[in-house]
A protein has these predicted regions:
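Polar, S/T/G-rich
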Residues: 1-150, 159, 215
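Surface-exposed, non-catalytic interaction/assembly patches
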Residues: 9-33, 132, 166-233
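A structural signal for short hydrophobic beta-strand segments in well-ordered beta-sheet cores
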Residues: 154-156
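Hydrophobic residues embedded in beta-strands of well-ordered beta-sheets
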Residues: 161-164
Length: 233
């Protein structure tokens, strides 16, 4: 009996655990694809976030006065995606920042501005700003924070006690300056105006975005300010 033992495989019947992971298994017939590698695309909703208790993420409606408490729910509101990134201890800055270190009241106002309906260009409406992204690589916390804030047209500011945010959005005027309430210089010209050069004023941009109607591939679209082009060229 000249039996030669080469190797063996042990099969252990246990239930594996994949914490903090969305795991998908797909079984396909190899005859349908031949030698080609199977590619898959998934439409994900992402993490369950902490959102205001008076907020309905599905309808984007706010009821009553917010008492400052939060509840778990799915949302693509940019402000609360930022809150999750700042306060989560596993993937975010939660080990450095606590809930009391982030100005949630400023994020509440910013989140309402993000939820306002604006024309979508096709006769309907859509939320002003949404976040449908996933973080796949480790980066510096400040870089990720800056990317989130730039998408909402806001800036992070440390006021000495908390991390707060200042957003570029329409608001009531704070003060009116005119010749009667400013110090008049010797030359008699209290106000001096400066402008950017015409060549520095951009009126066309190319936007890269994920097109769901084209297999979720990256598409490029040109967006132009036709009025500025007609005026300045």
């Amino acid at each position: 009996n000249k039996t030669l033992w080469s190797s063996y495989t042990e099969i252990i019947d246990v239930k594996q655990c994949y914490p903090n992971t969305a795991l998908v298994g797909v079984q396909v017939d190899s005859e349908q694809f031949g030698s080609q590698q199977v590619s898959r695309n998934y439409h994900l909703r992402g993490r369950i976030l902490q959102v205001p208790s008076n907020y309905n993420p599905q309808t984007r409606q706010y009821s009553g006065i917010w008492d400052g408490t939060l509840k778990p729910a799915y949302s693509n509101n940019m402000a609360w995606c930022l809150w999750d990134m700042l306060t989560h201890p596993r993937y975010g800055m939660g080990k450095r920042l606590g809930a009391a270190d982030v100005d949630k009241w400023a994020l509440y106002v910013i989140g309402q501005y993000c939820d306002q309906s604006v024309p979508d260009g096709f006769g309907g409406t859509e939320p002003r700003i949404t976040c449908n992204a996933y973080l796949t690589t480790q980066r510096k916390a400040w870089d990720v924070l800056s990317d989130f804030c730039s998408a909402m047209r806001c800036m992070p500011v440390w006021n000495g006690q908390t991390l707060t945010f200042v957003q570029d959005r329409p608001s009531d005027k704070v003060w009116t300056y005119n010749r009667s309430n400013v110090v008049m210089p010797d030359d008699g010209a209290p106000f001096r105006y400066s402008f950017s050069a015409l060549k520095d004023r951009h009126n066309a941009v190319e936007v890269n975005w994920i097109d769901p109607d084209n297999g979720w591939e990256t598409a490029t679209e040109l967006v132009e300010d036709t009025q500025a082009i007609a005026r300045y060229g």
